[in-house]
């Protein structure tokens, strides 16, 4: 279970992924698409469905991801947490949650694709960090929550192998930093021959 964090200011310092900005943008785009394709098929009677994050319904999960996307343009634009303030507090879904997601996701993706965006510094609550590190954390969140959402609505929960591989490569060396942070449930054991998606989910406290 992930902690209920809306503000990216609470992301964990120290992401050890060694891949470069081009790989980040590719992985981020794919993770965004994976989450989006599940959002687009949420039925009207599924908003209260539970998800693998036991404290979150489908609507709660989407609220979290919409909030994260709304923060991206101002943070990549150099704004501080205090400057953004309470702008994105409260309900960001309104009467049309899918449209709210589509708008926020498109604006976030455009911000990432701006020339030089991945080379910037973002101002988070724990201090300044690279946009690349922030981007990998957002990519991880999108990918893992795509699986959560798929489970919540009974959709296909398979993630692309290459996306699972790159996110697993980012998560594995960092998981010890997150122990006791409340960001994720403790890692789960998997068999030696488990596929990469199963390994990724298990590291983040999820059983496939």
Question: For each of these PLM feature ranges, what is it?
Answer:
Residues 2-37, 41-54, 74-208:
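Structured surface interface patches that mediate subunit assembly and partner/cofactor docking
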Residues 61:
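Extended, alpha-helix-rich binding/interface surfaces that flank or overlap catalytic cores
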Residues 64-65:
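Glycine-rich loop at the start of a catalytic domain that most often binds anionic cofactors/ligands
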């Amino acid at each position: 279970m992930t902690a209920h964090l809306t503000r990216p200011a609470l992301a964990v310092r120290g992401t050890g992924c060694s891949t470069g900005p081009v790989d980040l943008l590719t992985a981020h785009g794919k993770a965004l698409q994976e989450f989006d394709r599940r959002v687009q098929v949420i039925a009207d009677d599924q908003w209260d469905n539970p998800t693998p994050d036991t404290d979150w319904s489908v609507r709660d999960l989407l609220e979290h991801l919409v909030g994260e996307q709304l923060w991206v343009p101002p943070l990549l634009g150099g704004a501080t947490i205090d400057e953004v303030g309470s702008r994105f507090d409260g309900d960001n879904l309104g009467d049309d949650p899918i449209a709210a997601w589509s708008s926020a996701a498109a604006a976030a993706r455009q911000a990432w694709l701006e020339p030089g965006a991945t080379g910037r510094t973002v101002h988070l609550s724990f201090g300044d960090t690279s946009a690349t590190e922030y981007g990998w954390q957002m990519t991880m969140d999108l990918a893992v929550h795509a699986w959560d959402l798929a489970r919540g609505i009974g959709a296909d929960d398979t993630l692309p192998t290459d996306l699972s591989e790159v996110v697993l490569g980012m998560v594995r060396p960092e998981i010890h930093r997150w122990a006791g942070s409340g960001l994720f449930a403790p890692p789960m054991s998997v068999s030696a021959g488990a596929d990469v998606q199963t390994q990724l989910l298990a590291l983040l406290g999820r059983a496939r």
